[in-house]
Regions:
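Surface-exposed edge beta-strand/loop patches
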Residues: 39-41, 119-174
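The feature marks short-to-medium sequence segments in extracytoplasmic or secretory-pathway proteins
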Residues: 59-62, 72-122, 149-153, 159
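C-terminal motif of bacterial Sec signal peptides marking the signal peptidase cleavage site
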Residues: 28-29
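Structural beta-strand segments of beta-rich domains
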Residues: 65-67
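N-terminal secretory signal peptides and thylakoid transit peptides that target proteins
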Residues: 1-21, 25
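Short, conserved catalytic or interaction motifs in soluble domains
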Residues: 32
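A structural detector for beta-sheet-dominated domains
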Residues: 47, 54-56, 72, 80-82, ...
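Low-complexity, acidic Ser/Thr/Pro/Gly-rich terminal tails and inter-domain linkers that flank the onset
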Residues: 36-61
Length: 174
């Protein structure tokens, strides 16, 4: 006995297959390899092969947030204060951003490119008056702001984010 697969059956089963595939991706969850997240001590690899960045430690002493990084470049990269951002979220969901020239310093703060396969250990310091009221504190590292020699080709969708809230709340001095 044979079965003739009609056009109607084909369309019906094709639609069911499409729904099943779409549904399975919602159930498994998705992570974006271009935007990894972690906490203090985590090594993140934003951009799938651009670099490996580790936030070694984060402390706060009433007015200054200090973060120590270990960044291993896999391609030629700039590493300066424009590549870092600190996001502070308060109880009423107000977000305050510190980036570039807004109270951020980086040592070393080189405008030159670091060659591929170079290890750099920058220290980020940010002048922030009061973190005691913060509900969430995140440090963001953007390895490439734009394509080499092309300021119009932005890479700002590739970054790593560390949630440092627990580490900082443990170092706040009263």
């Amino acid at each position: 006995m044979s079965y003739t697969f009609s056009r109607r059956d084909f369309m019906k089963y094709t639609a069911l297959t499409a729904v099943a595939i779409a549904g399975s991706s919602m159930l498994t969850g998705c992570s974006n390899p271009n935007r990894p997240t972690g906490t203090v001590g985590s090594t993140l690899k934003p951009g799938d092969g651009i670099c490996e960045a580790t936030l070694k430690g984060a402390t706060y002493n009433r007015t200054t947030l200090t973060c120590n990084f270990d960044i291993y470049t896999k391609v030629s990269l700039q590493i300066n204060k424009n590549h870092f951002q600190v996001n502070v979220t308060t109880g009423d969901q107000t977000k305050i951003y510190y980036y570039g020239n807004s109270n951020i310093e980086l040592n070393p703060n080189s405008l030159k490119d670091y060659e591929a396969k170079t290890s750099v250990k920058p220290t980020l310091t940010v002048d922030i008056a009061d973190l005691a009221a913060a509900d969430k504190i995140e440090v963001v590292y953007i390895p490439k702001l734009w394509a080499k020699d092309s300021l119009t080709d932005s890479y700002s969708d590739i970054y790593g984010t560390w949630d440092i809230t627990k580490a900082i709340k443990g170092t706040i001095l009263s």
